[in-house]
């Protein structure tokens, strides 16, 4: 699986073929179905980033829908810096219980700990009135904002982007 640019990924117009488009861009053989709610939430997330004038280059090197089949685990968005942190962003199409968000991010940190890097975890929740953002610091869940995500993903440095398995 290869990393992609989020803007390019979200240019898929036909939601029914989004999964095939994603698999082609990422060179993924997984062929996992992508729900329409997931696509809409991803596009909402991207729209918020673009509204804050993010440079297109900072949308590069995202790993979308990475999964570990042996444990049935999927990560919505990862960005893995070679000499920096692992950024984990989970996307939710609606608000769920905060304890469930915290549990998921805690589990994700455990699975990502094999990278031996700092792990920065967020959950982006699309709501009827906009969005909510949460961060997990390894101890507790905190309400956050899109600016903190921007700060984390707009770092200079090389990222892993090829043959991520």
Name the predicted role of every residue range:
Residues 1-164:
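Accessory nucleic-acid engagement/destabilization modules that flank
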């Amino acid at each position: 699986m290869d990393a992609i640019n989020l803007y390019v990924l979200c240019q898929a117009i036909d939601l029914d073929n989004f999964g095939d488009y994603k698999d082609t861009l990422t060179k993924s053989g997984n062929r996992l179905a992508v729900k329409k709610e997931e696509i809409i939430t991803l596009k909402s997330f991207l729209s918020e980033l673009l509204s804050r004038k993010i440079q297109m280059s900072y949308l590069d090197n995202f790993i979308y829908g990475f999964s570990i089949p042996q444990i049935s685990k999927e990560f919505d968005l990862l960005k893995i810096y070679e000499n920096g942190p692992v950024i984990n962003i989970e996307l939710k199409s609606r608000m769920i219980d905060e304890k469930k968000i915290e549990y998921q991010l805690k589990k994700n940190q455990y699975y990502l700990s094999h990278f031996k890097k700092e792990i920065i975890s967020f959950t982006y929740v699309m709501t009827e009135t906009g969005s909510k953002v949460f961060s997990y610091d390894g101890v507790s869940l905190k309400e956050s904002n899109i600016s903190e995500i921007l700060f984390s993903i707009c770092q200079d440095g090389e990222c892993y982007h090829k043959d991520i398995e």
